[in-house]
Curated annotation (Swiss-Prot):
It comes from Cervus elaphus (Red deer). InterPro entries: 4_helix_cytokine-like_core, IL-10, IL-10/19/20/24/26, IL-10_CS. This is Interleukin-10. GO terms for molecular function: cytokine activity; interleukin-10 receptor binding. Major immune regulatory cytokine that acts on many cells of the immune system where it has profound anti-inflammatory functions, limiting excessive tissue disruption caused by inflammation. Mechanistically, IL10 binds to its heterotetrameric receptor comprising IL10RA and IL10RB leading to JAK1 and STAT2-mediated phosphorylation of STAT3. In turn, STAT3 translocates to the nucleus where it drives expression of anti-inflammatory mediators. Keywords: Cytokine, Disulfide bond, Glycoprotein, Secreted, Signal. Glycans are attached at N135. It is found in: Secreted. GO terms for biological process: immune response; negative regulation of B cell proliferation; negative regulation of cytokine production involved in immune response; negative regulation of inflammatory response; negative regulation of interleukin-6 production; negative regulation of membrane protein ectodomain proteolysis; positive regulation of B cell apoptotic process; positive regulation of cytokine production. GO terms for cellular component: extracellular region; extracellular space. Disulfide bonds join C31-C127, C81-C133. Its main location: secreted.
């Protein structure tokens, strides 16, 4: 059984490590730059998406919506952080890898779109007021469930609605900047 002084020493060490890590973490003042660069980042996402938008919207033969009002409601509500985080992960890990399988030109543009989305996610994480979350979003689970059921058509649906996703990102981040 370790002595109480050894345990105390370990606790002091861990507290010091945590304090030094927190000191090197970006502060709220560093988020000011993010708030200023967000419109440009969203514009770059929209421009990158415009290069594949027609391809995926022409292939999307479904009348139903994948990105529904309930997802936007989650973005606007207390689950906004988690919904945004999960949707970025969903597009990066499930949708875009499948979307890249439609020829070299499409792959190049989808890859560029994915890189821009990864950059946005990284900047959101650095500014903790935008992504301080851990709960699960039921609306995101619904999107993933419908996407899976649609199989190949799910890729067309999800990619054809990527502009809606960008709008939801903008709604969420604009709301967070006002808080």
């Amino acid at each position: 059984m370790p002595s109480s002084s050894a345990l105390l020493c370990c606790l002091v060490f861990l507290a010091g490590v945590a304090a030094s890590r927190d000191a090197s973490a970006p502060s709220d003042s560093s988020c000011t730059h993010f708030s200023n660069s967000l419109p440009l980042m969203l514009r770059e996402l929209r421009t990158a998406f415009s290069r594949v938008k027609n391809f995926f919207q022409m292939k999307d033969q479904l009348d139903s919506m994948l990105l529904t009002q309930s997802l936007l409601d989650d973005f606007k509500g207390y689950l906004g952080c988690q919904a945004l985080s999960e949707m970025i992960q969903f597009y990066l890990e499930e949708v875009m890898p499948q979307a890249e399988n439609h020829g070299p030109e499409i792959k190049e543009h989808v890859n560029s779109l994915g890189e821009k989305l990864k950059t946005l996610r990284l900047r959101l994480r650095r500014c903790h007021r935008f992504l301080p979350c851990e709960n699960k979003s039921k609306a995101v689970e619904q999107v993933k469930s419908v996407f899976s059921k649609l199989q190949e058509r799910g890729v067309y649906k999800a990619m054809s609605e990527f502009d809606i996703f960008i709008n939801y990102i903008e709604t969420y981040t604009t709301m967070k900047m006002k808080n």
